[in-house]
């Protein structure tokens, strides 16, 4: 017997029993961005490696340790995309979408990072993201946060997530703070863990994101970035909070929130949950006004967020909010005998035409009555439509209820569509 080939570690199949929940989440995401007037953009899975080195930053875990990078036959270094923002900016620059324009975009698709697989964190994962270009004011920051809050409302998890908010200021303010932070960290260098010592000079703000308890206790006395903000950055952050207060979105200012990517400035945020253990961040984003120019375009303000769908699905399962996921089939059509097969197929086709949202499965492969009913029940359908010689002669269909104790009944062929429309609405 030939050896079975398994999926690559950390890259998972989404099976038919799981896909309805994914489809529900995806439908909520699509409907929510449509309500705000955002347009979809689709970019390639493979990009030039330099795109991510220049955008994410060379001294980041993603670039240093996690990217799937390889050389093609021409010797060019290519990478499976680890996130969606850099590709969106690259596409915007390449196709002239960003200069002197406003764009509200969204994307959804697989991303790849070579990290240790664990619940809610995989090597291939699916990311949904929102990107806005050409608007530099705080009201658009508020809009993307309102959009994110709408997602939780529509998914029924608003009570289980919390918004954390911070500002990183502009590059000049951050540079001044960077020097102050380095000076502080140098005083405690011997107590820092290896990662923090490595980042202390190359990317000191990332030390603020350390999970090491000893480092966190040291940082309690670190200088605060808020003290280094100029008037414009302070006003931007104050206006954002005022707008969030006005629409009733609750948040917590977290001065240690810096995000893991180098390109953020001013507003940064995370939605977090206590229901997933260590994988508590379910959505994250912020403002990245310098990224478009950094990747070869003109200076363009930008803000957005991204979320991993695996983590959202896991959260819904953890909270046991998957009960209302419908079965893949509404109606199962069975022919009671070979002489009725043609009629059964015609009935199924007519229903698909007259009731396009009705999910109709036809029994194929023959078998006796017991076998067909067993298949109908397993399909998850509400009812089975039985067509035998007697039904054929009388121009009726027998409706057998599969999810309750209602007695089966006969329905005239010419009234079947109206009957099922009422039954399944």
From Swiss-Prot:
* Gene Ontology biological-process entries: histidyl-tRNA aminoacylation
Q: What is its EC number?
A: 6.1.1.21
The root-end lineage is:
Bacteria, Pseudomonadati, Pseudomonadota, Gammaproteobacteria, Alteromonadales
Per the UniProt record, the source organism is: Shewanella sp. (strain ANA-3)
NCBIfam families under this entry? hisS
For molecular function, the Gene Ontology terms on record are: ATP binding; histidine-tRNA ligase activity
Q: What is this protein called?
A: Histidine--tRNA ligase
Query: PANTHER family, per this entry?
Result: HISTIDINE--TRNA LIGASE, MITOCHONDRIAL-RELATED, HISTIDYL-TRNA SYNTHETASE
Q: List keywords of the entry alphabetically.
A: Aminoacyl-tRNA synthetase, ATP-binding, Cytoplasm, Ligase, Nucleotide-binding, Protein biosynthesis
HAMAP family in UniProt: His_tRNA_synth
Keyword Protein transport annotated: no
Catalytic activity as recorded in UniProt = tRNA(His) + L-histidine + ATP = L-histidyl-tRNA(His) + AMP + diphosphate + H(+)
Could you tell me which SUPFAM superfamilies the record lists for this protein? Class II aaRS ABD-related, Class II aaRS and biotin synthetases
Top-level EC class: ligase
Q: Which Pfam families match?
A: HGTP_anticodon, tRNA-synt_His
Q: Where in the cell does this protein reside?
A: Cytoplasm
Q: Which domain of life is it from?
A: Bacteria
Homology family: Belongs to the class-II aminoacyl-tRNA synthetase family.
Q: What is its main location?
A: cytoplasm
Keyword Cytoplasm applies: yes
Record-level GO cellular component terms: cytoplasm
Quaternary structure and interacting proteins, as annotated: Homodimer.
